[in-house]
Design a protein with these regions (language model features):
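Compositionally biased, intrinsically disordered low-complexity segments enriched in Pro/Arg/Gln/His
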Residues: 3-4, 14
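Positively charged, small/polar-rich N-terminal and surface patches that mediate targeting and assembly
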Residues: 17-140
Length: 140
């Protein structure tokens, strides 16, 4: 298929996917990892940064991504609440989940914090290795 006059031709055929030609050695996939992504929410950016920094200091997570402006609608104490929150995506390993749960009891500002752990089945090998290294018990 070609574009109108004045534009370069665009091929819709798939590229040659030969591994030695296409893949960056840092982009190899790691299957069946022990990595997890933990979801939680807090009320504002200040609470989010405070929580993530403390979890990083304790090596309970390798990374915390803050997604400001999330809107949560939920039932709480018999009423429907509609709140702006900050969603946190916490990258860690399943081996750190018990310690992370204990830290949530101590540090999380909510009475009933969201703590949902999602298994990461597949990820870039270097990234998975990085998560493991940053949350290693031997480094605490």
């Amino acid at each position: 298929m070609t574009r109108p006059t004045g534009h370069a031709s665009v091929s819709r055929d798939p590229p040659d996917l030969a591994p030695d030609r296409f893949l960056n050695p840092n982009c190899q996939l790691h299957m069946h990892t022990d990595a997890i992504v933990v979801l939680t929410t807090v009320a504002n950016d200040d609470e989010a940064v405070t929580l993530v920094r403390e979890l990083l200091d304790r090596r309970l997570i390798a990374c915390g991504t803050l997604v400001s402006g999330a809107r949560s609608l939920y039932r709480w104490q018999g009423k429907i609440a509609d709140e702006r929150e900050v969603l946190l995506l916490l990258k860690t390993r399943s081996a750190r989940l018990d310690a992370l749960q204990e830290a949530f009891r101590e540090l999380h500002p909510y009475k009933v914090p969201e703590l949902l752990a999602l298994s990461v089945d597949t990820g870039l090998e270097k990234y998975i290795e990085w998560i493991s290294g940053e949350t290693s018990l031997s480094l605490t």
